[in-house]
Design a protein with these regions (language model features):
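Rossmann-fold NAD(P) dinucleotide-binding segment
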Residues: 50-112
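Active-site-proximal catalytic alpha-helix in oxidoreductases
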Residues: 133-136, 157, 161-193, 205-216
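Interdomain hinge/lid region at the active-site interface
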Residues: 212, 216-275
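NAD(P)+-binding Rossmann beta1-loop-alpha1 motif at the extreme N-terminus of oxidoreductases
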Residues: 1-63, 87, 158, 192
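Hydrophobic beta-strand scaffold residues
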Residues: 26, 46, 113-115, 156, ...
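Rossmann-fold dinucleotide-binding core
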Residues: 3, 8, 94-173
Protein backbone atom coordinates (compact mmCIF):
# COMPACT_ATOMS: atom_id res chain seq x y z
CA UNK A 1 0.00 0.00 0.00
CA UNK A 2 1.29 3.46 -0.91
CA UNK A 3 1.26 5.85 2.03
CA UNK A 4 2.51 9.36 2.57
CA UNK A 5 3.65 10.88 5.83
CA UNK A 6 3.86 14.65 6.33
CA UNK A 7 5.91 15.89 9.27
CA UNK A 8 9.17 14.04 9.91
CA UNK A 9 9.99 15.34 13.37
CA UNK A 10 10.79 13.47 16.57
CA UNK A 11 7.59 11.42 16.38
CA UNK A 12 6.67 11.55 12.69
CA UNK A 13 9.96 10.17 11.39
CA UNK A 14 9.97 7.09 13.66
CA UNK A 15 6.35 6.32 12.73
CA UNK A 16 7.17 6.64 9.03
CA UNK A 17 10.22 4.40 9.47
CA UNK A 18 8.13 1.78 11.25
CA UNK A 19 5.57 1.81 8.45
CA UNK A 20 8.32 1.29 5.88
CA UNK A 21 9.75 -1.63 7.85
CA UNK A 22 6.25 -3.12 8.03
CA UNK A 23 5.90 -3.33 4.25
CA UNK A 24 4.21 -0.04 3.36
CA UNK A 25 5.50 1.97 0.40
CA UNK A 26 6.29 5.21 2.21
CA UNK A 27 6.88 8.71 0.90
CA UNK A 28 8.17 10.91 3.71
CA UNK A 29 7.43 14.62 3.37
CA UNK A 30 8.70 17.66 5.24
CA UNK A 31 9.21 21.25 4.16
CA UNK A 32 12.27 21.54 6.43
CA UNK A 33 15.34 20.44 4.43
CA UNK A 34 17.19 19.12 7.49
CA UNK A 35 14.25 16.89 8.49
CA UNK A 36 13.88 15.57 4.96
CA UNK A 37 17.60 14.87 4.64
CA UNK A 38 17.62 12.96 7.94
CA UNK A 39 14.83 10.67 6.73
CA UNK A 40 17.03 8.09 5.05
CA UNK A 41 15.03 4.91 5.61
CA UNK A 42 15.80 2.25 3.00
CA UNK A 43 13.11 1.75 0.40
CA UNK A 44 11.33 5.05 1.04
CA UNK A 45 10.87 8.14 -1.10
CA UNK A 46 11.26 11.74 0.01
CA UNK A 47 9.33 14.83 -0.98
CA UNK A 48 9.24 18.48 0.03
CA UNK A 49 5.80 18.95 -1.59
CA UNK A 50 2.80 17.96 0.57
CA UNK A 51 0.31 18.22 -2.30
CA UNK A 52 2.38 15.99 -4.56
CA UNK A 53 2.81 13.53 -1.70
CA UNK A 54 -0.97 13.40 -1.28
CA UNK A 55 -1.52 12.79 -4.99
CA UNK A 56 0.80 9.78 -4.96
CA UNK A 57 -0.64 7.96 -1.94
CA UNK A 58 -3.75 6.17 -0.69
CA UNK A 59 -3.30 6.92 3.01
CA UNK A 60 -1.79 10.14 4.31
CA UNK A 61 -0.34 10.49 7.79
CA UNK A 62 0.12 13.93 9.32
CA UNK A 63 2.26 14.83 12.32
CA UNK A 64 2.78 18.59 12.31
CA UNK A 65 3.12 20.49 15.57
CA UNK A 66 0.41 23.15 15.81
CA UNK A 67 -3.16 23.96 14.84
CA UNK A 68 -1.90 26.76 12.60
CA UNK A 69 0.50 24.44 10.77
CA UNK A 70 -2.25 21.88 10.26
CA UNK A 71 -4.71 24.43 8.87
CA UNK A 72 -2.06 25.84 6.54
CA UNK A 73 -1.25 22.33 5.34
CA UNK A 74 -4.88 21.46 4.60
CA UNK A 75 -5.17 24.78 2.74
CA UNK A 76 -8.95 25.05 2.77
CA UNK A 77 -9.37 21.49 1.51
CA UNK A 78 -6.73 21.50 -1.24
CA UNK A 79 -4.84 18.71 0.51
CA UNK A 80 -7.96 16.52 0.57
CA UNK A 81 -8.61 17.26 -3.08
CA UNK A 82 -5.04 16.20 -3.91
CA UNK A 83 -5.46 12.96 -1.97
CA UNK A 84 -8.65 12.24 -3.85
CA UNK A 85 -11.91 10.41 -3.24
CA UNK A 86 -11.42 7.18 -1.34
CA UNK A 87 -8.24 8.34 0.37
CA UNK A 88 -7.88 8.51 4.12
CA UNK A 89 -6.07 10.93 6.43
CA UNK A 90 -4.52 9.68 9.67
CA UNK A 91 -3.86 12.62 11.98
CA UNK A 92 -1.14 11.98 14.56
CA UNK A 93 -0.68 15.64 15.51
CA UNK A 94 -1.82 16.79 18.95
CA UNK A 95 -4.18 19.66 18.17
CA UNK A 96 -7.54 21.07 19.21
CA UNK A 97 -10.29 18.42 19.18
CA UNK A 98 -12.58 21.01 17.57
CA UNK A 99 -10.11 21.50 14.73
CA UNK A 100 -9.91 17.74 14.17
CA UNK A 101 -13.71 17.57 13.94
CA UNK A 102 -13.82 20.56 11.58
CA UNK A 103 -11.25 19.04 9.24
CA UNK A 104 -12.95 15.64 9.31
CA UNK A 105 -16.19 17.27 8.17
CA UNK A 106 -14.30 19.11 5.41
CA UNK A 107 -12.54 15.91 4.31
CA UNK A 108 -15.89 14.17 4.00
CA UNK A 109 -17.01 16.69 1.37
CA UNK A 110 -14.10 15.47 -0.78
CA UNK A 111 -14.90 11.81 -0.20
CA UNK A 112 -11.86 11.46 2.05
CA UNK A 113 -11.89 9.50 5.31
CA UNK A 114 -10.37 11.00 8.44
CA UNK A 115 -9.23 9.53 11.76
CA UNK A 116 -7.45 11.30 14.59
CA UNK A 117 -4.96 9.12 16.40
CA UNK A 118 -3.15 10.34 19.49
CA UNK A 119 0.01 8.38 20.26
CA UNK A 120 1.90 7.73 23.48
CA UNK A 121 5.26 6.10 24.00
CA UNK A 122 7.80 8.25 22.17
CA UNK A 123 10.05 7.71 19.18
CA UNK A 124 11.76 4.48 20.35
CA UNK A 125 8.36 2.84 20.92
CA UNK A 126 7.26 3.95 17.45
CA UNK A 127 10.28 2.29 15.85
CA UNK A 128 9.46 -0.95 17.68
CA UNK A 129 5.73 -0.81 16.92
CA UNK A 130 4.94 -0.41 20.61
CA UNK A 131 2.93 2.82 20.71
CA UNK A 132 -0.35 3.22 22.54
CA UNK A 133 -2.97 4.63 20.16
CA UNK A 134 -6.03 6.70 21.04
CA UNK A 135 -8.29 6.56 17.99
CA UNK A 136 -11.25 8.70 16.96
CA UNK A 137 -13.17 8.12 13.75
CA UNK A 138 -16.01 6.37 11.97
CA UNK A 139 -15.96 2.58 12.18
CA UNK A 140 -15.35 2.11 8.45
CA UNK A 141 -12.41 4.52 8.38
CA UNK A 142 -10.87 2.95 11.47
CA UNK A 143 -11.19 -0.51 9.94
CA UNK A 144 -9.47 0.64 6.74
CA UNK A 145 -6.63 2.17 8.73
CA UNK A 146 -6.19 -0.86 11.01
CA UNK A 147 -3.11 -2.26 9.15
CA UNK A 148 -1.40 1.09 9.81
CA UNK A 149 -2.39 0.98 13.49
CA UNK A 150 -1.26 -2.62 13.90
CA UNK A 151 2.12 -1.76 12.40
CA UNK A 152 2.89 0.98 14.92
CA UNK A 153 0.84 0.16 18.01
CA UNK A 154 0.77 -2.39 20.82
CA UNK A 155 -2.50 -0.96 22.16
CA UNK A 156 -5.27 0.34 19.89
CA UNK A 157 -8.25 1.97 21.59
CA UNK A 158 -11.08 3.16 19.33
CA UNK A 159 -12.79 5.63 21.64
CA UNK A 160 -15.52 7.09 19.44
CA UNK A 161 -15.87 9.65 16.64
CA UNK A 162 -13.23 12.06 15.39
CA UNK A 163 -12.04 14.30 18.23
CA UNK A 164 -11.92 11.51 20.79
CA UNK A 165 -8.36 10.69 19.77
CA UNK A 166 -7.30 14.27 20.52
CA UNK A 167 -9.24 14.44 23.78
CA UNK A 168 -7.75 11.16 25.04
CA UNK A 169 -4.25 12.26 24.05
CA UNK A 170 -4.70 15.55 25.91
CA UNK A 171 -5.92 13.70 29.00
CA UNK A 172 -2.88 11.42 28.76
CA UNK A 173 -0.57 14.41 28.48
CA UNK A 174 -2.33 16.26 31.30
CA UNK A 175 -1.80 13.31 33.63
CA UNK A 176 1.81 12.86 32.52
CA UNK A 177 2.91 16.50 32.78
CA UNK A 178 1.08 17.01 36.09
CA UNK A 179 2.74 13.88 37.50
CA UNK A 180 6.15 15.05 36.32
CA UNK A 181 5.62 18.45 37.92
CA UNK A 182 4.33 17.06 41.20
CA UNK A 183 7.09 14.46 41.44
CA UNK A 184 9.82 16.99 40.72
CA UNK A 185 8.36 19.35 43.33
CA UNK A 186 8.19 16.60 45.96
CA UNK A 187 11.85 15.73 45.43
CA UNK A 188 12.78 19.41 45.70
CA UNK A 189 10.96 19.55 49.05
CA UNK A 190 12.79 16.42 50.20
CA UNK A 191 16.17 17.89 49.27
CA UNK A 192 15.29 21.11 51.11
CA UNK A 193 14.60 18.95 54.18
CA UNK A 194 18.12 17.56 53.91
CA UNK A 195 17.49 14.22 52.20
CA UNK A 196 19.93 12.85 49.66
CA UNK A 197 18.19 13.13 46.30
CA UNK A 198 18.86 9.64 44.99
CA UNK A 199 18.29 7.99 48.35
CA UNK A 200 14.86 9.54 48.89
CA UNK A 201 13.77 8.73 45.34
CA UNK A 202 14.74 5.09 45.87
CA UNK A 203 12.90 5.01 49.20
CA UNK A 204 9.72 6.55 47.76
CA UNK A 205 9.85 4.26 44.74
CA UNK A 206 9.67 1.30 47.15
CA UNK A 207 6.43 2.60 48.64
CA UNK A 208 2.97 3.52 47.42
CA UNK A 209 4.33 6.76 45.89
CA UNK A 210 6.19 4.82 43.20
CA UNK A 211 5.53 5.93 39.62
CA UNK A 212 7.28 6.37 36.31
CA UNK A 213 7.09 10.15 36.83
CA UNK A 214 8.84 9.96 40.21
CA UNK A 215 11.52 7.76 38.69
CA UNK A 216 12.40 10.11 35.84
CA UNK A 217 11.04 13.61 36.59
CA UNK A 218 13.73 14.83 39.03
CA UNK A 219 16.35 14.30 36.32
CA UNK A 220 14.06 15.05 33.41
CA UNK A 221 15.80 18.25 32.40
CA UNK A 222 19.35 17.32 33.28
CA UNK A 223 21.76 17.06 30.33
CA UNK A 224 21.32 13.73 28.56
CA UNK A 225 21.35 12.88 24.88
CA UNK A 226 21.46 16.58 24.06
CA UNK A 227 18.29 17.40 26.02
CA UNK A 228 20.29 19.71 28.26
CA UNK A 229 21.05 22.09 25.37
CA UNK A 230 19.15 25.39 25.68
CA UNK A 231 17.48 25.03 22.28
CA UNK A 232 16.39 21.46 23.05
CA UNK A 233 14.99 22.45 26.43
CA UNK A 234 13.07 25.37 24.96
CA UNK A 235 11.76 23.10 22.21
CA UNK A 236 10.49 20.74 24.91
CA UNK A 237 9.02 23.69 26.82
CA UNK A 238 7.18 24.99 23.76
CA UNK A 239 5.79 21.55 22.93
CA UNK A 240 4.53 20.83 26.45
CA UNK A 241 3.19 24.36 26.91
CA UNK A 242 1.18 23.96 23.70
CA UNK A 243 -0.39 20.79 25.06
CA UNK A 244 -1.13 22.38 28.44
CA UNK A 245 -2.83 25.32 26.75
CA UNK A 246 -5.01 22.89 24.77
CA UNK A 247 -5.88 21.17 28.05
CA UNK A 248 -7.04 24.49 29.50
CA UNK A 249 -9.83 24.47 26.91
CA UNK A 250 -11.18 21.08 28.00
CA UNK A 251 -14.54 21.42 29.80
CA UNK A 252 -13.86 20.61 33.48
CA UNK A 253 -16.41 18.70 35.55
CA UNK A 254 -14.61 20.08 38.61
CA UNK A 255 -12.91 23.46 38.00
CA UNK A 256 -10.97 23.26 41.27
CA UNK A 257 -9.51 19.87 40.39
CA UNK A 258 -8.63 21.06 36.89
CA UNK A 259 -6.84 24.10 38.27
CA UNK A 260 -4.83 21.85 40.59
CA UNK A 261 -3.81 19.66 37.67
CA UNK A 262 -2.84 22.66 35.57
CA UNK A 263 -0.87 24.12 38.48
CA UNK A 264 1.19 20.92 38.64
CA UNK A 265 1.78 21.21 34.89
CA UNK A 266 2.93 24.80 35.36
CA UNK A 267 5.49 23.60 37.92
CA UNK A 268 7.02 21.33 35.30
CA UNK A 269 6.97 24.03 32.63
CA UNK A 270 8.69 26.48 34.98
CA UNK A 271 11.30 23.86 35.82
CA UNK A 272 12.13 23.26 32.16
CA UNK A 273 12.28 26.99 31.42
CA UNK A 274 14.60 27.55 34.38
CA UNK A 275 16.86 24.72 33.24
CA UNK A 276 17.02 26.25 29.76
CA UNK A 277 18.07 29.60 31.23
CA UNK A 278 20.73 27.93 33.38
CA UNK A 279 22.04 25.99 30.38
CA UNK A 280 22.20 29.19 28.34
CA UNK A 281 24.06 31.01 31.11
CA UNK A 282 26.64 28.22 31.38
CA UNK A 283 27.52 28.26 27.66
Amino acid sequence: MKVGFIGLGSMGAPIARRLARSGFEVTGCDIAPEMLEAFDEAGTKRSADPMETARQTDMLGICVRTDAQLEALVDGGALFEALGKGGIVILHSTVSPDLARKLAALAKTYGVGFVDVGVSGGGPAAIEGQLSLFVGGEDGDVERAMPWFEAIGKSIAHLGPVGRGQEAKLLNNLISIANYGMSAAIVDVAVALGFDREQIIAALMAGSAQSFALKVAPGFVRPRSGLGAPSSLMGLYDLLKKDVELCRNLPPSDPVAMEALLASCDVMLARIKRAAAEAEASK
